[in-house]
Amino acid sequence: MEGEKLNLDNIISRLLEVRGSKPGKNVQLTESEIKGLCQKSREIFLSQPILLELEAPLKICGDVHGQYYDLLRLFEYGGFPPESNYLFLGDYVDRGKQSLETICLLLAYKIKYPENFFLLRGNHECASINRIYGFYDECKRRYNIKLWKTFTDCFNCLPVAAIIDEKIFCCHGGLSPDLQSMEQIRRIMRPTDVPDQGLLCDLLWSDPDKDVTGWGENDRGVSFTFGPEVVAKFLHKHDLDLICRAHQVVEDGYEFFAKRQLVTLFSAPNYCGEFDNAGSMMTVDETLMCSFQILKPADKKKYPYGAGGVGSNRPVTPPRNAPAAQPKKGAKK
């Protein structure tokens, strides 16, 4: 939007207009509006640290994956910004039918409320992944490939971790064997792609595994798994109380690990129309007490929005501790 002013309030109200409509109705912003959202939010991401230091109270959400009407349900439940402060843990795009609406609303809120609304990078905010799992195809179908590249430039500037009141460590994936000091995260220079290995890769890709002692191989073929004592040591070393991460489907929308020292959050109910999982949002109050708000899976007859979505025939993020729930064999991403 060179020279043009971004009409943020108008963009937000158009994106919210479909509340109450039958899920699946698109909001077609102009290409220059979307470009403006990417460019302005990118400037804000770069003006703020790559390791955010945030204060409670706030609400934390896990993967959304283009399930736009569920994102609206989350806000209806938690309060539309600026009623509540939010931290999202990444994976805004791919899989669901409406990645564009989802990411555009999140970027618009980031620009409107830069000190109260925060977005971390997930492993799907990466060109090599969202080229394959639906976002590229959605951009190409509804706009053009150039716009997808504009999003890539924006995603390459997202922060990758946050610490809430010096006690809760948040990232999309998990811990890294390379992570000894928080300074290492602060030293990551942006813009950056997500490498195939190393600290940044692990923060976005690793998973906890109760059956592993120390570090293990990850079934995803990327990064590592880590056991309960890795969590305990990390928290003790950095004087933290909790790790909060996303990245895996969990049946109830949230799941504790390592004696409640780590929690996984997942905020896309009925993920891809192939799971009966709930979605959840974690509220952290001023005293750092955590509570969970649950989005039950919607009635499939009433809301058939997941079935047949972009990428519904592609392999799905594997659920934790629920091999029976896996809908299809295939690569695990």
UniProtKB/Swiss-Prot annotation:
<dbReference type="InterPro" id="IPR006186">
    <property type="entry name" value="Ser/Thr-sp_prot-phosphatase"/>
</dbReference>
<feature type="binding site">
    <location>
        <position position="63"/>
    </location>
    <ligand>
        <name>Mn(2+) 1</name>
    </ligand>
</feature>
<comment type="subunit">
    <text>Interacts with lab-1; the interaction is direct. Interacts with knl-1; the interaction is direct.</text>
</comment>
<comment type="similarity">
    <text>Belongs to the PPP phosphatase family. PP-1 subfamily.</text>
</comment>
<keyword id="KW-0904">Protein phosphatase</keyword>
<keyword id="KW-0539">Nucleus</keyword>
<feature type="binding site">
    <location>
        <position position="247"/>
    </location>
    <ligand>
        <name>Mn(2+) 2</name>
    </ligand>
</feature>
<dbReference type="GO" id="GO:0051301">
    <property type="term" value="P:cell division"/>
</dbReference>
<dbReference type="InterPro" id="IPR031675">
    <property type="entry name" value="STPPase_N"/>
</dbReference>
<keyword id="KW-0469">Meiosis</keyword>
<keyword id="KW-0963">Cytoplasm</keyword>
<protein>
    <recommendedName>
        <fullName>Serine/threonine-protein phosphatase PP1-beta</fullName>
        <ecNumber>3.1.3.16</ecNumber>
    </recommendedName>
</protein>
<dbReference type="GO" id="GO:0046872">
    <property type="term" value="F:metal ion binding"/>
</dbReference>
<keyword id="KW-0498">Mitosis</keyword>
<feature type="binding site">
    <location>
        <position position="65"/>
    </location>
    <ligand>
        <name>Mn(2+) 1</name>
    </ligand>
</feature>
<keyword id="KW-0479">Metal-binding</keyword>
<keyword id="KW-0464">Manganese</keyword>
<dbReference type="Pfam" id="PF00149">
    <property type="entry name" value="Metallophos"/>
</dbReference>
<dbReference type="GO" id="GO:0051321">
    <property type="term" value="P:meiotic cell cycle"/>
</dbReference>
<dbReference type="Pfam" id="PF16891">
    <property type="entry name" value="STPPase_N"/>
</dbReference>
<dbReference type="InterPro" id="IPR029052">
    <property type="entry name" value="Metallo-depent_PP-like"/>
</dbReference>
<feature type="active site" description="Proton donor">
    <location>
        <position position="124"/>
    </location>
</feature>
<keyword id="KW-0217">Developmental protein</keyword>
<feature type="binding site">
    <location>
        <position position="91"/>
    </location>
    <ligand>
        <name>Mn(2+) 1</name>
    </ligand>
</feature>
<keyword id="KW-0132">Cell division</keyword>
<dbReference type="GO" id="GO:0006325">
    <property type="term" value="P:chromatin organization"/>
</dbReference>
<feature type="region of interest" description="Disordered">
    <location>
        <begin position="306"/>
        <end position="333"/>
    </location>
</feature>
<feature type="binding site">
    <location>
        <position position="63"/>
    </location>
    <ligand>
        <name>Mn(2+) 2</name>
    </ligand>
</feature>
<keyword id="KW-0378">Hydrolase</keyword>
<feature type="binding site">
    <location>
        <position position="172"/>
    </location>
    <ligand>
        <name>Mn(2+) 2</name>
    </ligand>
</feature>
<dbReference type="GO" id="GO:0005694">
    <property type="term" value="C:chromosome"/>
</dbReference>
<comment type="function">
    <text>Serine/threonine-protein phosphatase essential for chromosomal dynamics during meiosis and mitosis. Antagonizes the function of air-2 in the regulation of chromosome cohesion. Dephosphorylates histone H3 at 'Ser-10'. Also involved in the activation of chloride channel clh-3 during cell swelling and meiotic maturation. Essential for embryogenesis.</text>
</comment>
<feature type="binding site">
    <location>
        <position position="123"/>
    </location>
    <ligand>
        <name>Mn(2+) 2</name>
    </ligand>
</feature>
<feature type="binding site">
    <location>
        <position position="91"/>
    </location>
    <ligand>
        <name>Mn(2+) 2</name>
    </ligand>
</feature>
<dbReference type="InterPro" id="IPR004843">
    <property type="entry name" value="Calcineurin-like_PHP_ApaH"/>
</dbReference>
<dbReference type="GO" id="GO:0004722">
    <property type="term" value="F:protein serine/threonine phosphatase activity"/>
</dbReference>
<keyword id="KW-0131">Cell cycle</keyword>
<dbReference type="GO" id="GO:0005634">
    <property type="term" value="C:nucleus"/>
</dbReference>
<dbReference type="GO" id="GO:0031965">
    <property type="term" value="C:nuclear membrane"/>
</dbReference>
<keyword id="KW-0156">Chromatin regulator</keyword>
<feature type="compositionally biased region" description="Low complexity">
    <location>
        <begin position="322"/>
        <end position="333"/>
    </location>
</feature>
<dbReference type="InterPro" id="IPR050341">
    <property type="entry name" value="PP1_catalytic_subunit"/>
</dbReference>
